[in-house]
């Protein structure tokens, strides 16, 4: 359970509250490259869940190991058939962070922010693209959301053209 929630969250940048609504039947037949349309709870806007190879592998492994029923929530509570709550995911992520001695305040929203940070710093994805992905009103909102540091600005100013 832990791995699938991490892999889907870190690879899609969706809000955890939207991921928690997923049922096994929503994803069990999806292949890499396929998408599923979701409606964001916060904004009411449509967005997509992308199945990349890592997400597909995590889903496949989870389904083989846990053998959930198609009508169950993908992220089910251990106390019945209800979906996990955002509070439960927050607690889970805080436990993960503590287990590896991370001292900052991590929670459910960390997966969404980390997606953007990695896309920007490792893959060079621009704020315009990330703003579209996040359904933000502008790249400026995304820049504030991801937190541009003065060190990054100074580093940019040191680039010689």
Regions found by a protein language model. Give the residues of each.
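Conserved catalytic core of the tyrosine transesterase superfamily
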Residues: 1-161
């Amino acid at each position: 359970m832990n791995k699938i929630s991490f892999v889907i969250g870190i690879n899609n940048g969706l809000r955890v509250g939207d991921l928690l609504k997923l049922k096994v039947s929503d994803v069990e037949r999806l292949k890499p490259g396929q998408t599923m349309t979701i409606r964001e709870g916060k904004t009411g806007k449509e967005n997509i869940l992308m199945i990349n190879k890592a997400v597909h592998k995590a889903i496949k492994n989870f389904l083989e190991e846990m053998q959930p029923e198609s009508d169950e929530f993908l992220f089910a509570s251990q106390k019945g058939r209800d979906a996990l709550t955002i509070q439960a995911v927050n607690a889970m992520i805080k436990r993960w962070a503590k287990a590896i001695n991370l001292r900052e305040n991590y929670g459910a929203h960390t997966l969404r922010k980390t997606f953007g940070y990695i896309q920007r710093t490792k893959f060079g994805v621009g704020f315009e693209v990330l703003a579209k992905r996040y359904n933000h009103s502008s790249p400026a909102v995304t820049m504030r959301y991801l937190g541009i540091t003065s060190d990054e600005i100074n580093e940019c100013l040191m680039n010689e053209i």
